[in-house]
């Protein structure tokens, strides 16, 4: 029997252990497996005096020691609990996986301040002992404990599945008489049923924590069906903070210009709630189907006596994040314009559609072999060569248009040498005709090859060296607006020319990073590092 909540602890937060009458050895205490993988790190668990006995020798030995502590959340205790009476324990006496924790001895907590659902309804005598602990951020349990928890299964009392249990109506005071809503003609008691939501893709942050706050509570009930045995003008239903969480967009809609239809609540049933406890009316698009207006009472706004008097034995349980306070409540006005529809039939249709889809997905006829998702690598560079066979790492190409279609953006062609022209300037006119013939012949002998973006850069550079003087340019500069073509080509040329130097610099950076990581690891483990670094320096010199 336990409850969990979120929390953290500052490093170095300790307190002195004073003389105590109850200090049990809880190293063998094991929590449910889901708690070790949950984002909630604080747990409140009931202890048993006959099992978790006081260790007198440990209490005398650790008296005066500094023990880790943390701030105990008051929201987990109803009423004004004496949280200052907690006794924080030494780390060696804590359960596995905990960095801090403390205990309330037998009878230390008053019965009215003891967490709800951690004691039996007919419990008599002093309150049982209680353990409050803060789990480490990452816990690695022994394999034996892991196998034991797998065999035992999950415990039902976890943070995500706590069910708020109402006290029975016969537990009211004798002079008070239950006025349950099921006995009235103007109100009906409904049960909120959530339609099955479509599967969502897995989140890259599986342990993302959404903080639970109850300053305002505005859920989205558009996907909720209200199941009622009798149709009345107004209906009341208990909501779930797990299935119907707070939605900030709904809160913004209630504060904006969007219309929120209102109605008057029966004054003989609902108390006058003002301020933060007032009912919040929702916009029509966030109401359940078949309702023209509705409002919600946030968790803790209505007293437990109200639930005991007006809900009583007919109140359907709903999972809650916090059972120390009363659950949220929905009060809705059924639409008279829209014809009432059969909710059970709608539910059956939803289940039938879900089952048929599941059967079709699981049948052999519907299963198709998965095709490998091979991404098509885009092109990068087009090169003019004088050989019909493409160079190593390249592929043949017919035209520049085909290269653009493959994604190529850079073209490389052989540059014209001007050394002969500078040495014999007087022979330019005589050789003009011969150059034209050579150019026409060379155009016929040129072939196109293209390289992918992940091709070997060494093969591309070697091919460019074999060409002699290679000139790079963009195939279609107009297709790249806002790109400085000259700067891009200059950087690409530097990559081709200085690729070996770039690799050496990266290798040196990785080498230095490994050196620092090993040094920090040795320092953290408090191991001798002189011999290690001498050996490391010898390897570097070699």
Curated annotation (Swiss-Prot):
InterPro entries in the cross-refs: DM7 (IPR006610)
Keyword Hydrolase: no
Region Disordered, residue ranges: 415-443
Keyword list, A-Z: Repeat
Signal sequence residues: none
Listed Basic and acidic residues bias regions: 415-430
Highest taxon above the source species: Eukaryota
Keyword Repeat belongs to the record: yes
Family indicated by similarity: Belongs to the DM7 family.
Name the UniProt record assigns to this protein: DM7 family protein GG17591
Organism: Drosophila erecta
Lineage: Eukaryota, Metazoa, Ecdysozoa, Arthropoda, Hexapoda
């Amino acid at each position: 029997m336990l409850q969990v909540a979120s929390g953290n602890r500052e490093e170095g937060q300790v307190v002195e252990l004073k003389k105590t009458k109850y200090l049990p050895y809880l190293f063998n205490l094991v929590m449910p497996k889901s708690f070790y993988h949950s984002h909630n790190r604080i747990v409140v668990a009931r202890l048993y005096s006959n099992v978790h006995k006081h260790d007198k020798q440990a209490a005398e030995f650790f008296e005066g020691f500094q023990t880790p502590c943390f701030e105990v959340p008051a929201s987990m205790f109803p009423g004004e609990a004496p949280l200052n009476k907690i006794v924080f324990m030494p780390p060696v006496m804590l359960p596995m996986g905990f960095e801090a924790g403390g205990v309330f001895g037998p009878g230390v907590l008053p019965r009215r301040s003891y967490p709800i659902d951690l004691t039996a309804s007919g419990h008599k005598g002093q309150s049982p002992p209680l353990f409050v602990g803060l789990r480490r951020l990452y816990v690695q349990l022994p394999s034996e404990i892991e196998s034991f928890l797998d065999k035992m299964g999950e415990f039902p009392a976890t943070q995500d599945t706590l069910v708020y249990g109402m006290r029975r109506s016969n537990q009211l005071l004798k002079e008070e008489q239950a006025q349950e809503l099921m006995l009235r003609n103007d109100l009906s008691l409904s049960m909120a049923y959530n339609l099955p939501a479509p599967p969502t893709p897995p989140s890259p942050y599986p342990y993302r924590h959404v903080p639970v706050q109850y300053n305002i509570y505005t859920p989205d009930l558009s996907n909720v069906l209200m199941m009622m045995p009798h149709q009345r003008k107004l209906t009341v239903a208990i909501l779930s903070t797990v299935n119907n969480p707070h939605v900030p967009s709904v809160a913004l809609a209630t504060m904006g210009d969007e219309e929120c239809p209102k109605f008057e609540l029966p004054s003989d049933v609902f108390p006058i709630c003002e301020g933060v406890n007032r009912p919040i009316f929702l916009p029509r698009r966030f109401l359940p189907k078949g309702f023209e207006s509705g409002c919600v009472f946030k968790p803790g706004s209505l007293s437990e006596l109200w639930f005991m008097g007006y809900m009583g034995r007919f109140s359907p349980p709903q999972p809650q994040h916090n059972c120390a306070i009363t659950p949220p409540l929905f009060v809705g006005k059924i639409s008279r314009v829209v014809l009432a529809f059969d909710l059970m039939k709608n539910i059956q249709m939803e289940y039938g559609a879900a089952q048929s889809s599941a059967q079709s997905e699981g049948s052999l006829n519907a299963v198709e072999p998965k095709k490998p998702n091979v991404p098509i690598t885009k092109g990068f560079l087009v090169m003019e060569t004088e050989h019909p066979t493409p160079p190593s790492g390249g592929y043949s190409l017919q035209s520049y248009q085909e290269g653009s279609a493959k994604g190529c953006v850079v073209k490389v062609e052989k540059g014209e040498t001007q050394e002969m022209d500078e040495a014999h300037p007087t022979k330019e006119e005589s050789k003009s005709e011969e150059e034209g013939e050579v150019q026409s012949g060379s155009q016929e002998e040129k072939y196109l090859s293209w390289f992918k973006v992940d091709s070997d850069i060494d093969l591309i550079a070697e091919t460019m060296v074999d060409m002699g003087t290679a000139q790079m340019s963009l195939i279609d500069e107009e297709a790249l607006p806002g790109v400085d073509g000259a700067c891009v080509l200059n950087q690409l040329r530097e990559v081709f020319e200085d690729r070996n130097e770039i690799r050496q610099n990266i290798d040196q950076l990785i080498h230095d990073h490994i050196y620092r990581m090993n040094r920090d690891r040795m320092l953290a483990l408090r191991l001798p590092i002189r011999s290690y670094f001498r050996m490391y320096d010898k390897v570097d010199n070699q």
